[in-house]
Curated annotation (Swiss-Prot):
Residues 33-47 have a biased composition (Pro residues). Its main location: membrane. One of its GO terms (molecular function) is calmodulin binding. GO terms for cellular component: caveola; cytoskeleton; cytosol; Golgi apparatus; nucleus; plasma membrane. One of its GO terms (biological process) is mitochondrion organization. Binds 1 FAD. Binds 1 FMN. Heme b binds at C186, Y477. It is found in: Cell membrane; Membrane, Caveola; Cytoplasm, Cytoskeleton; Golgi apparatus. (6R)-L-erythro-5,6,7,8-tetrahydrobiopterin binds at S104, A448, W449, F462. Belongs to the NOS family. InterPro entries: CysJ-like_FAD-binding, FAD-bd_FR_type, Flavdoxin-like, Flavodoxin/NO_synth, Flavoprot_Pyr_Nucl_cyt_Rdtase, Flavoprotein-like_sf, FNR_nucleotide-bd, NADPH_Cyt_P450_Rdtase_alpha. This is Nitric oxide synthase 3. It holds the Pfam family NO_synthase.
Length: 1205
């Protein structure tokens, strides 16, 4: 973060964060520019930057045309010239006068902010508030929005009624970062975006101040890996005293005045040392005694608090070659934390806002140790070095100073404590100047403070002219609190130890209600299609509540601009279809991809497009990702932070390895957050639904909690308690749930909207037709629905339709017979949960669970709850606590704890909840358990099989009716929930549904572009809409589009050749040029699949269409087929295009980028031996490899024989 220091007691060039504030346009102390008057420059939006000239003595400068006057700024080393246009935004005069330059004064009186006797004038405050609010909304690109206008009105109303206003937390974070960014004396501002802001505005006492400060020191010190941070206490309020920290820094060494007038310790701290003694501190007698803190709450006497020794990290100083140096007994503390400056944001003044960074080595080695009015060790070291101190021409001071600085750097690096040398710091400042010139048109800078105290002209900043001015927000000086008449309460108080304060907080009921507010805030985001990611996110929220203040949000409820102000974000997300985000994560994904990062601030448009379209291509092996990841590894605390510089994050992805793009969206989010400057606390977690997903999530969640606690230095006592957070005894207790009778009955469509949190519409059945032969043992149906022209059911060919089916009535009735305490059959009920009370807070109360609408138990099991999917390990653990038979309890416990045993049981039996209860008959089944613990019944998605132009007001579906037996064909018969229901519908029956767009699976807008369509079985569904659309183009628009090629596959030509007559008709009318069919079970013919047709009959055409004619290829079907087709196309391109297989893979990647290779992939269609054994074997081998050493949830990069992400 650069160096932050207490300026009031250490004048001169800064250390620490270097946040001195010498101001005034004439405060520059460098070489004088030959231009006596300011030049004219363009408007602030486009600052003029002439070409850099290599000849510093004669730079070429083209004077811009007429425009406002701005300072011309020259770099005398490079000869380059820029214009500072940002200074036009300064609203405050500097300390200088027309006749007198005061730029070299350390504390010009004009720059000190003194408490005013009354509140500031309302119009003055409003002017500053408007300016700041405008800055904030401009920064988030919402300037002029409705939210912006409403916020301005809100501030104006608050000022009118109270004389002041309050910042939102995001505004406070933005303001604190901007104040650092605007600090003219700080040399380390390149890291301004990484400032961690702790909001302590709820603080009400000196004791609470001390707790916050201890947390700040612990977080910022971070065992030597220092992190920049600021803690902001309540703002100055009219008619009330201030919160103040009397010490100039949180950590300082005492200075003891001796009888002979000398000082033992640090002479800069004599006054505060004597004040501490007056307030009860028992002093030591060492040269490096850490001072206690004097903290003052409004209108109260200051209180004294002793910092615990383990909180203060110190570094003993030694020299890499001078062995005697260690014997000098020198040391210095690691954390520079300025605590006596005032933070001003939008006219609001925060009189206590300690901030910290890390040291620049010269501040310790030159200023603190060598200054004559400080430790003054220069001559002692020179004598030990045998230097001639009798004459200045021996340069003994310079030689000794260099060795002392070398010792400081060596010692800090040896102790692994963050520090930066003055050369690296000044080079980074030049980068910052360049960044700011491009971003804002200038940068306020005080040359006298930016140039380090040694090696002046050896650093690049010495040769750089700078312009000094005041911007808001800002850090400002303020008078010492013990000086003047403003101090109240001069009484002496007894010192309080850290342990006393901690115990006081622990036992004080009045403080318990505010403890949560003091915790670090965590945001948990989820995106889910089935609800499982949401369930995991809620479990994560319960875990993090042990030590953090978490909130759980769906991605579509979250404003992505808030990421810039977050401290900790955890993401739990699934991946939909072909590597896409779930629907409720699409807006988040789009906004995340639009943000710019520190290593790709100006990405080419095609890179943005690639990132937005191909989430599945964001992997560790991508060249773009590898490039910026390498830059990030090479970066340091002297490099620019990204937009998310203060963000720490963890990501967990849910998916199925049956899909080729396993957890692709989670990988994209994880990669993108790091690219934008966020810090990954934990490796990406992944859970495979085919094998051990819940176990993987539990392991990842505990590891994420542990890493977060360590990062934010919280929750030591919570780590042990978190070990059993996933225990069923903790997650569900019978006595905490009850049913309450509700007056209102269920209306199905509003109920589905409530449950699924999305718009739903009702269509009605026109017809249901079996497309297979009557001789076939299987069924594929064409379902025609009437949409009644509803706008919400408008679609384009290639889109999906979501159907909300009910469970089979027989299954529901059988399950109801097992419920131990069912409510009356016709009574609408709701679940209520007992919320715990808190000491000093509200008492325990019953709160309605909002997951389900009021309905009967039968309605809940029919329309809203999933009773056919195998119960999760978590639900089995819960059922084990309700089993009365010990053997059944043990078996359920074993199934829930042994991932392999569970997966074998699940895949062999694929049991419904009813079958589980039949296997374990002693399990009691309370009604509240069903209503709160069963997963939601999810919509089923189908490709739309029609074109709206061909069938206005209708939507068609092509559905394979699913029926199979479990247990190797010997178990009970299972039916597809939705397909079986659809097959039984009659004309006029209602169907709740909605449209989900598939913009990446659409016909090209140019009808003359050639297309190849590949879809076996029900994979032909979206292509029916395609050929209907093309027929409409031919017959209604008179177009002659390029004939398409269709590759279809089925078992037998006489049984399941879907839409054969329609396809033949479309071919005759010019839609298709070629139609080829692969039969896998045709009598007296070899098995043939669609990929065989591509390889043997269409190889040349595939290459020509994709590589020469810029055509498109569409593939629709299950994951195994899509993967085989992809591999076949890759081999065809390699063979026909005379290239290596890897090169052909790159070509396919480009085709995907250009949206010319399209896939519409669905999961395992039937539980065939071939598919399940292959996928599960792979999953188990991965799991067993993890058990041999790797964590079971960690990201596995693709190997040479495995599909990519």
């Amino acid at each position: 973060m650069g160096n932050l220091k207490s300026v009031g007691q250490e004048p001169g060039p800064p250390c620490g964060l270097g946040l001195g504030l010498g101001l005034g346009l004439c405060g520059k102390q460098g070489p004088a520019s030959p231009a006596p008057e300011p030049s004219r420059a363009p408007a602030p939006a486009t600052p003029h930057a002439p070409d850099h000239s290599p000849a510093p003595n004669s730079p070429t400068l083209t004077r811009p045309p007429e425009g406002p006057k701005f300072p011309r700024v020259k770099n005398w080393e490079l000869g380059s010239i820029t214009y500072d246009t940002l200074c036009a935004q300064s609203q405050q005069d500097g300390p200088c006068t027309p006749r007198c330059c005061l730029g070299s004064l350390v504390l010009p009186r004009k720059l000190q902010t003194r408490p005013s006797p009354g509140p500031p004038p309302a119009e003055q405050l409003l002017s500053q508030a408007r300016d700041f609010i405008n800055q904030y909304y401009s920064s988030i690109k919402r300037s002029g929005s409705q939210a912006h206008e409403e916020r301005l009105q809100e501030v104006e109303a608050e000022v009118a009624s109270t004389g002041t206003y309050h910042l939102r937390e995001s505004e406070l974070v933005f303001g604190a970062k901007q104040a650092w960014r605007n600090a003219p004396r700080c040399v380390g501002r390149i890291q301004w975006g990484k400032l961690q802001v702790f909001d302590a505005r709820d603080c009400s006492s000196a004791q609470e101040m001390f707790t916050y400060i201890c947390n700040h020191i612990k977080y910022a010190t971070n065992r030597g890996n220092l992190r920049s941070a600021i803690t902001v206490f309540p703002q100055r309020a009219p008619g009330r005293g201030d919160f103040r920290i009397w010490n100039s820094q949180l950590v300082r060494y005492a200075g003891y005045r001796q009888q002979d007038g000398s000082v033992r310790g640090d002479p800069a701290n004599v006054e505060i040392t004597e004040l501490c003694i007056q307030h009860g501190w028992t002093p030591g007698n060492g040269r490096f005694d850490v001072l206690p803190l004097l903290l003052q709450a409004p209108d109260e006497a200051p209180e004294l608090f002793v910092l615990p020794p383990e909180l203060v990290l110190e570094v003993p100083l030694e020299h890499p070659t001078l062995e005697w140096f260690a014997a000098l007994g020198l040391r210095w503390y690691a954390l520079p934390a300025v605590s006596n400056m005032l933070l001003e944001i939008g006219g609001l003044e925060f009189s206590a806002a300690p901030f910290s960074g890390w040291y620049m080595s010269t501040e310790i080695g030159t200023r603190n140790l060598c200054d004559p009015h400080r430790y003054n060790i220069l001559e002692d070291v020179a004598v030990c070095m045998d230097l001639d101190t009798r004459t200045t021409s021996s340069l003994w001071k310079d030689k000794a100073a260099v060795e002392i600085n070398l010792a400081v750097l060596h010692s800090f690096q040896l102790a692994k404590v963050t520090i930066v040398d003055h050369h690296a710091a000044t080079v980074s400042f030049m980068k910052h100047l360049d960044n700011e010139q491009k971003a804002r048109g200038g940068c306020p800078a005080d040359w006298a403070w930016i140039v380090p105290p040694i090696s002046g002209s050896l650093t690049p900043v010495f040769h750089q002219e700078m312009v000094n001015y005041i911007l808001s927000p800002a850090f400002r000086y303020q008078p010492d609190p013990w000086k003047g008449s403003a101090t109240k309460g001069a009484g002496i108080t007894r010192k309080k130890t850290f342990k006393e304060v901690a115990n006081a907080v622990k036992i004080s009921a009045s403080l318990m209600g505010t403890l949560m507010a003091k915790r670090v805030k965590a945001t948990i985001l989820y995106a889910s299609e089935t609800g499982r990611a949401q369930s995991y996110a809620q479990q994560l929220g319960r875990l993090f509540r042990k030590a953090f203040d978490p909130r759980v949000l769906c991605m579509d409820e979250y404003d992505v601009v808030s990421l810039e102000h977050e401290a900790l974000v955890l993401v739990v997300t699934s991946t939909f279809g072909n590597g896409d985000p779930p629907e409720n994560g699409e807006s988040f994904a789009a906004a995340l991809m639009e943000m710019s990062g520190p290593y790709n601030s100006s990405p080419r448009p095609e890179q943005h497009k690639s990132y937005k379209i191909r989430f599945n291509s964001v992997s560790c092996s991508d060249p773009l990702v590898s490039s910026w990841r390498r830059k990030r590894k090479e970066s340091s605390n002297t490099d620019s932070a990204g937009a998310l510089g203060t963000l720490r994050f963890c990501v967990f992805g849910l998916g199925s390895r049956a899909y080729p793009h396993f957890c692709a969206f989670a990988r994209a989010v994880d990669t993108r957050l790091e690219e934008l400057g966020g810090e990954r606390l934990l490796q990406l977690g992944q859970g495979d639904e085919l094998c051990g997903q819940e176990e993987a999530f539990r392991g990842w969640a505990k590891a994420a909690f542990q890493a977060s606690c360590e990062t934010f230095c919280v929750g030591e006592e919570a780590k042990a308690a978190a070990q059993d957070i996933f225990s069923p005894k903790r997650s569900w207790k019978r006595q905490r749930y009850r049913l309450s009778t509700q007056a209102e009955g269920l209306q199905l469509l509003p109920g589905l909207i409530h449950v699924h949190r999305r718009k739903m519409f009702q269509a009605t059945v026109l017809s249901v037709e079996n497309l297979q032969s009557s001789k076939s043992t299987r069924a594929t149906i064409l379902v025609r629905l009437d949409t009644a022209g509803q706008e919400g059911l408008q679609y384009q060919p290639g889109d999906h339709i979501g159907i909300c089916p009910p469970n089979r009535p027989g299954l529901v009735e059988a399950l109801l017979s097992r419920v131990e305490d069912p409510p009356p059959p016709t009574e609408s009920v709701a679940v209520e949960q007992l919320e715990k009370g808190s000491p000093g807070g509200p008492p325990p109360s019953w709160v309605r669970d909002p997951r389900l609408p009021p309905c009967t138990l039968r309605q809940a099991l029919t329309f809203f709850l999933d009773i056919t999917s195998p119960p999760s390990p978590r639900l089995l653990r819960l059922l084990s606590t309700l089993a009365e038979e010990p053997s059944e309890q043990q078996e359920l416990e074993t199934l829930s704890q042994d991932p392999r045993r569970y997966e074998e049981w699940k895949w062999f039996r694929c049991p419904t909840l009813l079958e589980v209860l039949e296997q374990f008959p002693s399990v009691a089944l309370p009604a509240p358990l069903l209503l709160t613990q069963l997963p939601l019944l999810q919509p089923r998605y189908y490709s739309v099989s029609s074109a709206p132009n061909a069938h206005p007001g209708e939507v068609h579906l092509t559905v394979a009716v699913l029926a199979y037996r479990t247990q190797d064909g010997l178990g009970p018969l299972h039916y597809g929930v939705c397909s079986t229901w659809l097959s039984q519908l009659k004309t006029g029956d209602p169907v709740p549904c909605f449209i989900r767009g598939a913009p990446s699976f659409r016909l090209p807008p140019d009808p003359y572009v050639p297309c190849i369509l590949v879809g076996p079985g029900t994979g032909i569904a979206p292509f029916r809409g395609f050929w209907q659309e093309r027929l409409h183009d031919i017959e209604s628009k008179g177009l002659q589009p390029a004939p398409m090629t269709l590759v279809f596959g089925c078992r037998c030509s006489q049984l399941d050749h879907l839409y054969r007559d329609e396809v033949q008709d479309a071919q005759e009318r010019g839609v298709f040029g070629r139609v080829l069919t692969a039969f896998s079970r045709e009598p007296d013919s070899p098995k043939t699949y669609v990929q065989d047709i591509l390889r043997t009959e269409l190889a040349a055409e595939v290459h020509r269409v994709l590589c020469l004619e810029r055509g498109h290829m569409f593939v629709c079907g299950d994951v195994t087929m899509a993967t085989s087709v992809l591999q076949t196309v890759q081999r065809i391109l390699a063979t026909e295009g005379d290239m290596e297989l890897d090169e052909a893979g790159d070509v396919i990647g480009v085709l995907r980028d250009q949206q010319r290779y399209h896939e519409d992939i669905f999961g395992l269609t039937l539980r065939t031996q071939e598919v399940t054994s292959r996928i599960r074997t792979q999953s188990f081998s991965l799991q067993e490899r993890h058990l041999r050493g790797a964590v079971p949830w960690a990201f596995d990069p693709p190997g040479p024989d495995t599909p990519g992400p």
